């Protein structure tokens, strides 16, 4: 009986130590995952800033911002990608010059083209929603990018019309589409194609939990 009790106690001790080590390993894994998340989100916020600095002045500046948004969600997934876009926008709001033309500040969001910047976040959220509903299949990823782009166009165009009407005068939707959307459709579709191909390759190199 003594030997049996001794063996039982030893077994309990060993099991307890094993569980303790597993808990420690689990905690370390969670902490490491959170660290990775923070780093990846920060990196893609910087990438979006760099994409915005590559700019051609137009009524709505031509930039690679949408490419940056699509890459962020494509590589990091909907949740992390959306957070990266949010961080990027918040950096701009507090004055960090991450927007087109090395600009920053809340005033950028409040001017004619600010709706397109806000639209980036809603594009990412739409992509996240579609990913959550239908997974990460290639056709879903491409479709989510296209739908996200349409959402960005819609928000930006409505915002532009409202602000322009208040500050300058009435303007028709056809005119605004001609200024702010139509010239960008083909370039944006090219960005979607590039982001789709590159994000699927980069995602294989990025360790994700």
Region spans (language model):
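Hydrophobic transmembrane alpha-helices
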Residues: 25-82, 94
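Short helix-perturbing small/polar motifs within transmembrane alpha-helices
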Residues: 25-28, 43, 50, 106-154
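Membrane-interface elements of multi-pass transporters and channels
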Residues: 32, 54-58, 79, 94-98, ...
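Alpha-helical membrane-inserting segments
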Residues: 47, 51, 55, 72, ...
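Interfacial aromatic-anchored transmembrane helix boundaries in multi-pass membrane proteins
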Residues: 52-64, 89-123
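Alpha-helical transmembrane segments and their helix-entry boundary regions
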Residues: 81-85, 108, 141, 176
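Membrane-embedded alpha-helical hairpins and interfacial helices in multi-pass inner-membrane proteins
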Residues: 136-209
